[in-house]
Structure formats: structure tokens, C-alpha cells
Amino acid sequence: MYKRQVSNGHTAAIFFSFKDSANKPSVEEIEKMWAEYKGVPQELNLPHAPKQFIHVYTEKDAPDQPQIKTAREIDGGMAISCGRLRESTQYDYKMVSMSHNTLRGAAGGAVLLAELLTAKGYMD
């Protein structure tokens, strides 16, 4: 295995299939679902929540994205990026996702969790 040193970012290559592959959504439908997704932090408009949780790169507009250096700072590093969504020969689809490991992961994730717990009344 070869590991390349990358600062402040995690990239995941994801392969997935649907339970009913014959009726799977199209690439465009999946990208639309991602782009429109809003979680509880967005619904509550928490201070450190990204405005758009999932930033979508389409094959048409950015076929080689996400890339660490260009995607890790989106929405203050709190958004995740998805792209390169393509049909797969072994699964229904394959894709690449990227997030900032300290801003979204450790530090920012802890701050966002504290904001959520406070908003839900678990903390003062």
C-alpha cells in the first residue's frame, strides 16, 4: 500500500449499490438529493454549520473533483465534497468524497456538536 502525505483532508473512494438496482436513481437524481440535503444543524441554523452540508461536483462541470487543495476550505472547512459519481461495473455507482479532517472532523465537529447539544437543551 502506498500512502501519500496530505495535509488537512480525508478522501474516500466509495462504491455502492441499491437494494433494487433495477430501479436505482440516476446520477442526476443522486446529485440533486445531495445538493438539497439539509441536516439538523442546517435546519437550526447553527453558527458553525455549513450552509450547504454537501458540496456537489458534477461530472459535466468538474470531472476531476473533489481535490484536497480546492475543496477542503469550502464553507469554512465544515462542508463535505462529493464528486466523480459514475456508474460502476461491479456496483451500481462509484464516487469520491472529501472532508477537512480537523475543521470538519475533530475541532469543528466538536464545536458543532456542542452547538447542537445547546440548541436541543442538553447544555446551558
Language model features with spans:
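C-terminal substrate-binding/catalytic lobe of Rossmann-fold NAD(P)-dependent oxidoreductases
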Residues: 3-94
